[in-house]
Amino acid sequence: MTVALVLHRADGAPLSTSFRRAAFGKNDPFARNREIAWEGPDSMIAGRVSLVGEHRIASFPHIETIVVVEGELTLETAGQAPLVLGPGAGAVVGCGTALRMSAESRTRFVFCAAACKRPTKTGLAPLRADADFKPTATLPADVLLGPAPECRSDNAFTEDDVEYKAGTWDSTPYHRIVRPHRMNEFMHLLAGGVRFAAPDGSVLSMGAGDALFVPQGAPIGWESSERVAKFYVVQSVHASTGRD
């Protein structure tokens, strides 16, 4: 079973992740440029896109969280100030959004997208490192190998139809056992470092500027020795809808 898929390394180190060029649905605006690392039965994908130039989309066909890792990307929609995203900046594009997207030079972003048949949220939701953090639940004692952390989050976007949430999260250091991941999760680390443990004892070390995706059910542990902050996308998957 896949434990974690590395989508980007800030230091430019080569990736072992396999990407395939493919569109996400018949109306994908990035069909020629999309590289998919993971696609689940729950209509969620994660990967990367490289592009240059201008793209005008009358109605964005899905939900997509974008975090720029190289270059600069400008997102514009009616009724909102333009968002200019440089490396480490991100935003969520709601399904159905009329969007103008432009990049004057080659730009790359990592993404986590999901299909949505009954969208309720359109527009752009910026992701912010200096988020309005609020305390959130810590981890249960039976999965911790040490003191319980203090966790905070700021949820910037929610689409209830597909249980898709995106925002910013941070935590004090903690050590957690290897266990099945409770949801699909995209992470772009903003600060700190994490050692993700696999059942075979191997460890994947990730730091600020790195991005990865962990599928629901993948067995994985967490160990951090400093404050960690990240942009996240999470999605719960249910067997009743063919998602598990």
Task: Map each language-model feature to its residues.
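Ligand-binding loop in jelly-roll beta-barrel domains
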Residues: C95-T120, Q216-S240
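Conserved short histidine dyad/triad with adjacent acidic residue
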Residues: P29-E35, G40-F60, R152-R182, P215-Q216
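A conserved acidic, glycine/proline-rich C-terminal tail/linker
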Residues: I177, G193-S205
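Ordered, small/hydrophobic-rich secondary-structure cores
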Residues: M1-A91
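Conserved hydrophobic/aromatic beta-strand scaffold that supports enzyme active sites
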Residues: A46-R48, T65, G90-V92, A166-T168, ...
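Short acidic-glycine-tyrosine-enriched beta hairpin
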Residues: G79-G96, D200-G217
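Surface-exposed beta-loop interaction hotspot
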Residues: M101-D160
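Short, conserved beta-strand element in jelly-roll/cupin
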Residues: F60-T74, P180-F196
